[in-house]
Amino acid sequence: MSDIFNQFQQQIYQQKILIAFSGGLDSTALLALCKKLQENRPHFQFRAIHIHHGLSPNADKWALHCENICRQFSIPLIVEKVRVDKSNGIEAGAREARYHAIANHLNIDEVLATAHHLNDQTETFLLALKRGSGVQGLSAMQKESVVFNLPIFRPLLQFTRAQLEDYVKSQKINWIEDESNEDNSYDRNFLRNIILPKMKTRWAHFDQAVYRAAQHCFEQTQLVNELLEDEFQKIFEKNDRTLSVKLFDRYSYIKQKALLRLWLARLQLAMPSQKQLEQLIRDVIFAKPDAIPQFKLANQVIRRYQQKLYLTADFADLTDVAVPLKISQTVPLPDGLGHISLREQSGCFVFSWRHYQVQLPPCKQPIEIRFAYSGKVKLHKNGVNQDIKKVWQNLNVPPWLRNRTPLIFYGDQLKSAVGFFKVFDC
């Protein structure tokens, strides 16, 4: 048992770690190894976090088990309950909820340590192969990476599950078994419980071979990215993280896809399928010049505007939204747009939204905040009536932000687009 610990401690160079602790075998092994490491390195600090997904009838028991284990070994533990959005599947929703919860607790000087091991790597590789992934997907998991903007460390990646089980048993620590691990309707469980045991009876070192293959794929991915970096920097705007596609037709189709993958990786997005990537190139990048194309990827949207690709949230349609507003009121706006307030000051109505303020003449008509208008406006005394679309274009406001800007209406008369312009009254 000293061999596994000696190998483990050689990989740990961080001073502070937050362990994702489910109470299962793998994370229990990681917890026990870190506890022993702390005995040898007094300056090494670690905590644990248990995410209560609420998906199993045993979820409360698992949380209690984790509390008992951590109390037994004097390990600080955070238990965080989350709500899982199942719209994109339970596994994806649980993963996203888990990482978002962890992000709220991970200190700036900590890394998140997960207990992924060699068998997990094999499963991840084969699942990527099943999806038809390229070398980036077949790179599977790396010892260090960034997920949801969190620094992830996987110190057990070269150990087998059997090694971890032997170690935990030697420490006489109990662990929990998730009943869903026996449900072979999940692809990962199907591989783990049915396919891989048969493969390993024929090829005993299959896991180690897959690990090497994943490393080869990772190196190829790194090499491609390194060779593309100079070209990528010419079209990547660091300030707004956009990608210029003005000269995209000069690149080969293969290079177009590689540059897009590199951009998406910089934005820390899951890689789209080959079909999705081809659709993005065809329907967004090379859409008609006057089009307003967009492409939904998971819960975000890639949009083209003025020959640049932007990544935005999947915003709600606010076309029919109208929010009444009265003097001395502060009211919430929809879809995470914050609050807008109205007060009377020195004979004017003062509207405040975010860091913007608009002063308008007082009125007795009902006041509403809307988000859509398709008529003409006049911005200056000697100006002409212009279509509002032209006004937005002259201000270089992207189409999706136009429909998220509070429009102040006195009755049915547009008075101002907060932060951008006021309408001139004749």
From Swiss-Prot:
EC number(s) on record? 6.3.4.19
Top-level taxon of origin: Bacteria
Localization: Cytoplasm
Pfam families per the UniProt record, alphabetical: ATP_bind_3 (PF01171), TilS (PF09179), TilS_C (PF11734)
What positions does the entry give for ATP binding?
S22, G23, G24, L25, D26, S27
Q: Which HAMAP family does this entry report, sorted A to Z?
A: tRNA_Ile_lys_synt
* Family assignment from sequence similarity: Belongs to the tRNA(Ile)-lysidine synthase family.
The free-text domain note is: The N-terminal region contains the highly conserved SGGXDS motif, predicted to be a P-loop motif involved in ATP binding.
| Name of protein | tRNA(Ile)-lysidine synthase
Where does this protein come from, organism-wise? Answer: Mannheimia succiniciproducens (strain KCTC 0769BP / MBEL55E)
The root-end lineage is: Bacteria, Pseudomonadati, Pseudomonadota, Gammaproteobacteria, Pasteurellales
Supply the gene name: tilS
